[in-house]
Amino acid sequence: MAKKEFKAESKRLLDMMINSIYTQKEIFLRELISNSSDAIDKIYYKALTDDALTFDKDSYYIKVAADKDARTLTISDTGIGMTKDELEQHLGTIAKSGSLAFKKENELKDGHDIIGQFGVGFYAAFMVADVVTVISKALGSEEAYKWESAGADGYTIEPCEKDSVGTDIILKIKENTEDDSYDEFLEEYRLKAIIKKYSDFIRYPIKMDTTINKPKEGSENEFEEVQEEQTVNSMVPIWRKNKSELTDEDYEKFYAEKHYGFDKPLTHVHISVDGAVRYNAILFVPENMPFDYYSKEYEKGLELYSNGVLIMNKCADLLPDHFSFVKGMVDSEDLSLNISREMLQHDRQLKLIAKNISKKIKSELQSLLKKDREKYETFYKSFGRQLKFGVYNDFGANKDQLKDLLLFYSSKEKKLVSLDEYVSRMPEEQKFIYYATGDSYDRIEKLPQTEMVADKGYEILYFTEDIDEFAIKMLASYQEKEFKSVSSGDLGIDTDEDQKQSEEEESKYKDLFEEMKNILSDKVKNVRISKRLKSHPVCLAADGEVTIEMEKILNAMPDSQNVKAEKVLEINPNHEVFQTLQDAFEQDKEKLSLYTNLLYNQALLIEGLPIQDPVEFTNNICKVMV
């Protein structure tokens, strides 16, 4: 029997198929099972137009069987089979897709769609097999044929015996090498795991002889191992079921089965779209933050299926970074896949799906915020920081999408409030949305800078996370109300009369403040009368865009550039200390220097900033005491 050469394109092309197109050897089983599913689909299509042919789904299946002794793995199907000419055309010509040709000839939908389109998946078998044998009997044919190949040097075709219509693919599994173990593809547990991973939702049963323990006949305590044929795959994916048929428990079970998390999902979104791009999706918002969420090891992304076949474990392009906590899957018939079906081409369909998914996630979170505040706050405590990063990142490109999802602790409500809730209860005369920053709510409560704003009866938002102020700076305003730090130079509270009084006081004490500024040198930009202090003697404010809290955060980062806020030392003219400063200015410049440095260091401590010279500070305290 003469060996025939592959028609297309030689040894180099087949080597590329085996060694370059696929990144994981286990993919071979997915490809062969998908081909078997296509073969059964073809009978279904023919039955739609051929009255003499009936299609009883229960009669069709795929069988996977391993023989460790013979070192073979067999994938059988009860599909349409192939004639000698079809074996020649589809297996003798690399990259010739029989499924694609069949689809073009049979433009029928009816809920079915054939998976194969490239004609290269079959050759993935050579990644794990030295010899591949195909025994096939076509529907309506009396003859069966055997196709066999050991790789790029060619193949043979000869008549053979086969009782039933369908195809058997027999792989002679390679021997182990130093780098690769091929034994795993003969192990029952491994084969089942690969089937569950990639082909769990193939619409036909995938059967295997499975080892189970059963009580020995006539004995209650003794067990024996027996082989029992079982269906490995689930077949009907949950996402193709009608939402009205499913319960929360069904979604929770799916979440657990897919190992999306150890917790229960906080909420889920079930999407079915049959428009320009057809797809189904189930998305989950976890209750708890994964332990590695803010580490380099965490991978965002959704599982991506094409016609129920897993293509990617983590398709990052389907989720924006600010929704990277979302788990779940997408299944579509309309995606443009690369030749190995392992990767997506970056196309319009993918972008449309990703855009719609992002809208659905936001809509679900907004609904949760309005209808189940307790559940939303549970979510926010885990993932609110990520939403704030989303506002700040990409130069604020997503800030308008995310701003209504933000929550901050309120000085009045003593709980988390939304920006909309804050603005809705602002007094008419209030011009700004006020905020204060600090390490904790308790610490912010005690900040001297909050006194004036609180005295006016205005609500203050408390920022305790390092991203908070950066996000708000990017947001800039909400419902035409600008954000204003209680530590900013101008609080926007003064009346014309207040402003006039301040200018008079600044002029009156100008010489004192200039002397204090000279004492502190470049530590501060200015020294001035405080319009915000009521009971405290001193505080630091910041002029310019960089606030004192931002200075702390930026300088704590690796490779920091020693960022400095433009600090201003503010003195309360109504505090007893101020008279002491005036007396020292007029009578004892050395004491003025001592008091000025003490007050400056006191202001640093209030802000949580380090004192440059702690020894000098403690010595100065001792000098005052004696």
Curated annotation (Swiss-Prot):
Positions of the UniProt region annotated as C: 553-626
Region annotation (B) ranges: 342-552
SUPFAM superfamilies: ATPase domain of HSP90 chaperone/DNA topoisomerase II/histidine kinase, HSP90 C-terminal domain, Ribosomal protein S5 domain 2-like
Keywords: ATP-binding, Chaperone, Cytoplasm, Nucleotide-binding, Stress response
A UniProt-annotated Pfam family: HSP90
Cellular localisation: Cytoplasm
GO BP of this protein: DNA damage response; protein folding; response to heat
Domain of life: Bacteria
Location of region: A: 1-341
UniProt-listed InterPro entries: HATPase_C_sf (IPR036890), Heat_shock_protein_90_CS (IPR019805), HSP90_C (IPR037196), Hsp90_fam (IPR001404), Hsp90_N (IPR020575), Ribosomal_Su5_D2-typ_SF (IPR020568)
Subunit note: Homodimer.
Main function: Molecular chaperone. Has ATPase activity.
Protein name: Chaperone protein HtpG
Species assigned in the record: Bacillus subtilis (strain 168)
Lineage: Bacteria, Bacillati, Bacillota, Bacilli, Bacillales
